[in-house]
């Protein structure tokens, strides 16, 4: 009976893994030092930079809550993730991410699509793909985006729920990412 409950909890834990896409919306001026430090830890150094973190990462919820007035975040879907990796994914030397590179370095025969699936399941964490011997990123953990086509729909000083752009937006982040690619 207890073993069945543990197996059920493991299944629930695997289903609850969400991949957060976090985008810095506001700039560097007048940022509180604590917030600036947290943005640095999240690798969000400039406007329109995007990072991907799993929801199961310890402390990620508290870090996002601290910087909620400078970023927007939500759960990224598979199609948007594949398009993001193809169009904005970079490797060391600022070269574009390709299927051949993923197959060679990570051993994933499905290329970028398989990488996206493993990222969504939480099997691979983008921020941990670092080659310590060569001291280079296998895949850079930061995606540099354009400002959104058509501009922002609301103020970048108000929360998303109040007609602005900041804070949690759930699956609506995918539409914003597609406009910024």
From Swiss-Prot:
Keywords: Ribonucleoprotein, Ribosomal protein. GO terms for molecular function: RNA binding; structural constituent of ribosome. CDD domains: Ribosomal_L7_archeal_euk. Coiled coil: none annotated. The keyword Ribosomal protein applies. The keyword Nucleus does not apply. GO terms for biological process: maturation of LSU-rRNA from tricistronic rRNA transcript (SSU-rRNA, 5.8S rRNA, LSU-rRNA); translation. It holds the Pfam family Ribosomal_L30. Gene3D superfamilies: 1.10.15.30, Ribosomal protein L30, ferredoxin-like fold domain. One of its GO terms (cellular component) is cytosolic large ribosomal subunit. It comes from the Archaea. Belongs to the universal ribosomal protein uL30 family. Part of the 50S ribosomal subunit. This is Large ribosomal subunit protein uL30. It comes from Hyperthermus butylicus (strain DSM 5456 / JCM 9403 / PLM1-5).
